[in-house]
Design a protein with these regions (language model features):
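C-terminal regulatory
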Residues: 1-103, 129-131
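A late-sequence structural motif
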Residues: 95-131
């Protein structure tokens, strides 16, 4: 399963700073909230961050990154399904950022057929397919 990521901004951020017109505008004129390990995972995102003038907040927590984006501190990169669940966030799909990340489950081979573990794995699989 591939988890899809996109850029999001809050309505309060967009009313104050406007929408970025393109990636260059994002880098030069907009505030970015950043999860520190994302650049090591996606070269496309690293290139954007390296060229950004205003990285205003950095965190190692997905929950904190989402909170900062919702609070209007800056634009953030989030799983699309998570960002779309937040009523105040707008997906900036017009920028054309298409980043995905593999999502997988690991279990010990001796336990994967136990009913409780199999039920949990099946449940996680069903939930992630809805993301």
């Amino acid at each position: 399963y591939e988890l899809q990521f996109g850029l999001f901004a809050s309505m309060s951020y967009l009313s104050k700073f406007g929408y970025p017109n393109n990636i260059k505008d994002l880098q030069e004129n907009h505030r970015i909230c950043y999860r520190e390990n994302y650049a090591g995972v996606w070269p496309q995102w690293k290139k954007i961050i390296d060229g950004a003038r205003h990285v205003v907040a950095t965190t190692n927590s997905s929950a904190m990154l989402l909170r900062m984006t919702c609070d209007g501190i800056g634009i953030g990169l989030h799983p699309i399904a998570i960002g779309k669940r937040e009523r105040d966030l707008i997906h900036l799909s017009q920028l054309g950022i298409k980043i995905s990340h593999p999502f997988w489950i690991v279990s010990h081979k001796d336990g994967q057929d136990e009913p409780k573990i199999k039920a949990l794995i099946d449940h996680i699989r069903e939930v992630t397919l809805q993301l």
